Amino acid sequence: MTEPVPPVVGFKRHLGTAVVPGDAVYVLSEEGATALRGPHLESLVPLLDGTRDFAALRRELPAGIPADEAAAVLTRLAEAGLIGLRPGVSDAESAYWDAVDGEAGRGRVAVLGADPATTDVLRAAGLTVAEDADLSLVLCDDYLADHLSDVDAEHRRTGRPWLLAKPLGARVWLGPFFTPGDGPCWHCLAARLWGNRPAEAHVRDALGLPGPVPRPPVALAPLTAVALNLVALEAVKWLAGQRYPGQRALWTFDSRDLTGERHEVRARPQCASCGNPDLVRDRTRRPVVPASRPKSRTDGGGHRALPPEQVLEEYRHLVSPLTGVVKELRRDTRGPALFASFRSGPNTALGRRGAERLRTALRSENGGKGVTPIQAEVGALCEALERHSGHYDGDEERVRASFRSLGDKAVHPDTCQLFHERQFADRARLNARHGPFQFVGEPFDDDEVLDWTPVWSLTRGEHRLFPTALLYFDAPGPPSVLADSNGNAAGGTLEDAVLQGMLEVVERDAVALWWYNRTRQPAVDLAASGDPWIAELCEVYAGLGRELWVLDVTSDLGVPALAAVSRHVGGPREAIMLGFGAHLDPAVALRRALTELNQMMPAVLDGWDGGDDPDAVRWLRDATVATEPYLLPAPGRPVLRPDASSPDLLADVNLVRRRLEDAGLEVFVLDQTRPDIGLPVVKVIVPGLRGFWGRFAPGRLYDVPVRLGRLTEPHGYDDLNPMRIFL
């Protein structure tokens, strides 16, 4: 019987050593060199070459080195991870496993979608290809191929992990590992991938395809060989027990410039395949109950529950052009640095109809504004997440019925959309003349059966039903009901989001009352603000050859609402641009109006002429302060408004709500927070308040200016401003 060969002791096989007498022992690896100094090291290190077991090492100890001192040196080297026990075999492959602190991976793999060359590569890596396997390798031409749904279902049934890869194409895709019952499934990944391929999704739906649009194969033998060997490497590491966060990611390798990128893949808790598809419905059924929430900041960026740095840290993982909810965050460099404007991908609030018509509109992308770059970056991120959360997914709570059959349980959409009967009658001409933001739908049919979603009334403390298509972008519904972004808001907490949504509907109502009635409003004294940022901003605008002023357009609701206006001087075109802001703190309202103006300005400075938005084209081409005198401040002293904000967001929410209710209005909040996003998102709805798009039904638009003393009698329909707000 052969005696077992004892393990040898030596430096890890990926480490080299060099003794410099009188200086140090140097340990070298791919990562660099480390100098070791201490008693007996220069004498002991040559013996640790991996050819001796402990007995041989003890026999060959140099004279003068006691065994206990030698043992102490070896212990310290072992604790540092430099030496260890191992078999006597030493080669490049075993050195690799020492370098990654593991043992050689061996196991059985099943392969789907591969050619014979793949099997050869796997066998060369020491793997056994068999149907009864520990791991499946699934190779495909496209990660959205429809057959992968069946592959995913089968692996979830058996519990076998699988690795997805696309070894073809100029850009190779590898990963993630799917482990049934733990982490995301293929459907979680597919939802994100389709979300970042909207044009292809449109083609797929238009042509009735089961999966992605077929593409011609792209391959190069050296690249394919590299890709297959990377697949084999990841499989070997997995079977060796190697685990690291990147295995949950999609890794791409671009052969054109040899760059690699990692795109995180996370489970969607509401996934119909691996999660709980009732999560969104359950949230909608619950009451919306704001709680006390002290503010963390009360600076010019707004009164918020969380600092922007924390928000960015918590939600940055959602940014990726492949697996993210947000495609990108990029600074808009077309204007001065003080503008601090960021962009964050396509604006889904346009819906498919609007996106097709407004590819170059001012609002065709999500954006963020702020006094500082971090505020603007977080604003862009949150706006994109807000838009995504407001997009129809199909798992929303819905009741199918007609308005007439629901009775008092439902809110009529006309109280929210506020189109005039003459707009319905003239809709064909109006829709041809104006952009999608001004689109006039068909008259609502009270007997038509459609989907309704419950929305919580803060005023009544109960749910009432609104048309689902009024609440979610691209939700199926009749052409009489259209969703828009008015009142959609995100925040660090629910209370934060509710307050921002309330302030937005108040702001847009105030702007509409001023704009469409064309009343002159008092100016805000910018010099008296004492804000050094505003003083610097005025200088920047002057350097651009532009005038800057701000109007107070506050309505009967008493929440400070401001309109910032800028025009170019010294030329035939004034290229007038605007920005709006509202807040209980008038200083914050002022900064918000100015930062929104800053957000709009880069496009104008870049020569934008309105793109394919006819309202913007007419405005930038024709509008001047001479033709639109309501843009100029009214004579008289500026109005000074008190700061009514408090240190707690709940108190602010309740104050704005009371002011709305005192005006005879009801406040609704729909919680649109998505489980896979986490950022609180709401839609605030106040029937009767005006959006700032051209919707001219009777109501506040005509009555409030008279009550405020701006007009002696209400304007008629034909007297309203023919220029539409295009922001």
Spell out what each predicted region is:
Residues 1-32:
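Long, low-complexity, charged/polar intrinsically disordered regions in eukaryotic proteins
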Residues 230-238, 382:
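Short glycine/serine- and small hydrophobic-enriched flexible loop segments
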Residues 74, 119, 148-156, 538, ...:
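Short amphipathic alpha-helical segments and helix-helix/interface helices
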Residues 121, 133-227, 237-242, 254-286:
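E1/E1-like adenylate-forming module used to activate ubiquitin-like modifiers
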Residues 63, 76, 259-727:
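Helix-biased "structured C-terminal domain" signature
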Residues 248-254:
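Polybasic (Lys/Arg-rich)
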Residues 129, 162-163, 548, 667:
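Hydrophobic beta-strand scaffold residues
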Residues 23, 29-129, 164, 171-180, ...:
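Long, charge-rich, low-complexity alpha-helical segments
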